[in-house]
Each structure stands twice: as structure tokens, then as C-alpha cells.
Amino acid sequence: MTMKKLVVLISGLLAAITTFAQTPQLRTEIFDLIDFDHPGLENVKALHQNGQDAEAASALLDYYRGRKGIVTATIRDLSKVKISPEEKKWADEGLEHTFFVHYGYQPSYNYGEDINWKFWPVKDMELRWQLHRHKWWVPMGQAYKVTKDEKYAVEWTKQYIDWIIKNPYDDPDKENLRFSWRPLEVSDRLRKQPDMFMLFVDSPAFTPEFLTEFLVNYHKHAEHILANYSEHGNHLLFQAQRMIGAGCFFPEFKRAKTWSDSGVGILNREINLQVFEDG
């Protein structure tokens, strides 16, 4: 075998491994996290109790695709979703792994065909932190809704799974952990991911398996904030606000009320500490 053929073979194998790694898996632990007595989940409950978890995940996806009356602060009506030229640029560059992270560093950096979430082209803490806010993902969802082009949904699901795999909560790389799981970034993802959910949930790329990956990951984010609230200041207020949103957008979780109640309690306490008599 010539060196050229060997390089082609190795490249093909690496591409296949990456594709497999980005394939969502059925996360059966989701059935321990949701409240089967929530209205509308009767079929999900029956299928799970019958040992049909794949079918239960499909039923759960059907439930979410048909769910009414729950929206986000930024997306009230999916039929009115728009995208600016700047947002479209972020979405299109995101397809090529050129990620808009920070206005202070333009043009945006490319993070490689096999995304390197640890890439730190300029040693500015904000550049590394804000990478994990995924600012180009909501624009990808807007682009999907406006253009109906599945390439945005397909790429978003791949990047979402890739991030989960490469940035685990129990990451032994402690330096990476302090960027990827800093509470402010975690709360920012809590805020934005319901928008992504609304924008992408009807896509064929949003499979039942992906749904379970998404929900388990989202649950982990909320629990992380609950255990790691900032001590004071604006970070704490952001986190509390976003925990309220998490519980309200996903009331199907057993812990949803705990999340929302924690946020309400903090805001009620902090308004007396952070706002003086003169306003």
C-alpha cells in the first residue's frame, strides 16, 4: 500500500469514527427524570412500563412536537421568526465550524473539521468562556426556520452531540472544565437552548434519540446551577432568572418546580439586598 493510499484510508476511518461519535444514542435515564403523571405523557408512561423505551422516546417526541402554550421570551410565534444578515452570516459560517464567539475578535476563528473546543487562539479568558455560549446555534435555528434547509438542523445536532462528548461534566481536564462548565456559561445555555428546541424540534434530524440526549443534558445543566449558584451579584441574578425559565419551559421534569422555586427565592431575596430605598 502506498503512502498516499494509507493517508486516504486513515482519513476515511477518522471521518467514520467522528460520524459515529456524533450519532445520538437513546438515553434511557431520561425516563427517571420526567414526571409520567404530567398531562399528555400517558402513552410515554405506558410504553416505558412495557419495556418499549425506543417507542416511548418516539412518543415523547410526538408529545413535544404537539405541545401548545409554552414559548420563550424571545420566540412567541414560530411563524414570525426572522433572521438578520449578520445572524445569517453566523449561521452559515457555523456550518463550516467558523464560530462567532466575540465581537472583539473578528473575523471569527475556525475551530477545525473535527471541532476543537479547547482551541484558544488569543489568550483572552472571555474568548474561551464565550465559545461555550454557542452564539451561532440560535441563528442556525433561525436560518432553518426561514429557509427550511435541513443542513442547518443536521449540523446543529452534530455539533450539539460533539460538544456533549468533548465537554463532559466530569471532565478530567480541569482547565477545560472551568471554561465549559462555569456557572455563567451554563446558565446562558439554559436560557438559549429552549429557543433552539422550538426552532429545531420539527426537523427530521431531531430524532427521538437526539431528544433524549438533549433533555438529559439540559437536566444536567439545571442541576449544576442548583448546586453551584454564584454567591452574589449580577451572575447570581442571571442564573436565578434562567432557572425559573428552565422550570417553566420543561415542566415535564420532576425537578422543574424545584428549579423555578429556587430562582424565585433568590430574586425575592436579592431585590432587598441589591436595590436600595431610592431605587
Task: Mark where each language-model region is.
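Aromatic-lined, polymer-binding surfaces characteristic
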Residues: 109-111, 123-279
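Bacterial Sec-dependent N-terminal signal peptides
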Residues: 1-23
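Extreme N-terminal leader/anchor segments
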Residues: 22-102
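Short alpha-helical hairpin
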Residues: 99-117, 131
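Basic side chains
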Residues: 4-5, 27, 76, 133-135, ...
